[in-house]
Amino acid sequence: MRPNPRPRTGKSVPPVLDLPPPFRLVTLREVGDAFLHAQQVAAEEGAGTLVYVGRFDLAEFAVVLEPDEPLRVARKAFYAGMNALFDALLAHAPPEKPIAIDWPDAIRVDGGLVGGGRLAWPKDTAEDAVPGWLVFGGMIRTVSMTDEAGLHPLETALDEEGFEEHGASALVESFARHLMAAIDSWQQDGFGELTKDYLKRLSPEKGARRELGENGDLVVRWAATDQTDRRPLVDALETPSWYDAKRGGPRR
């Protein structure tokens, strides 16, 4: 990402995050949409812009990236974002707390859905053209808003799972640091290590050997039948599996 030390914040909310360079903070009120706003300002504000929404119940943020590869390859930056989000959760999780990714975008803690990641790019960009920007958006349910335990058995929140009580801001700060490490690894060592890290974090599928194609597709080889399935990343990103558009947050 292109470094730029200029601080930028929303008009109504002061900076609340301690971010490493080259990140620049834009803060929105609780009713804001970090993912949408980051797309709207990406071309003007550029790489390193991190949009954060101050919410009590969610860690909601989005970051602008500027790739130098064609879209079909650059889209794999999504996996760097997912690894960084996973690592941020791991850093604040209780010991031995199970965390897993449902390919490609949903994150579960001890089997319960807490949120996930999204990726956007200029829709008029051809697959073999370099996109002007990418936006990775993340959203994690930090606090449960229901008092009825067991009402939604397939979802959970960080407060219910014993996570450290540092709140959404600490999680996003941790994400930023881990994302920088992931991008540095990609630039220096190629995508291989990021691939390994991501694949080992996927929820298990019995009898499946999984790998990522050059364009980010998930390739699944079944030991029992010698059959191979290919799951296109671009199709999966079209409709995030974890996101409830009506609620504006993770599914229940």
Give the positions of each predicted feature.
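Acidic (Asp/Glu) carboxylate-rich active-site/surface patches
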Residues: 93-129, 138-139
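Conserved, helical-rich catalytic subdomain that frames metal- and/or nucleotide-binding sites
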Residues: 163-216
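N-terminal lobe of the biotin/lipoate ligase/transferase fold
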Residues: 1-95, 113-114, 120, 212-216, ...
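Membrane-proximal amphipathic alpha-helices
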Residues: 228-232
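Non-catalytic alpha-helical scaffolds and adjoining flexible linkers that form interface surfaces
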Residues: 122, 135-137, 141, 179, ...
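Short histidine-centered catalytic/ligand-binding loop motif
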Residues: 63-76, 154-168
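Short, acidic (Asp/Glu-rich) active-site segment that either coordinates a divalent metal cofactor
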Residues: 128-161
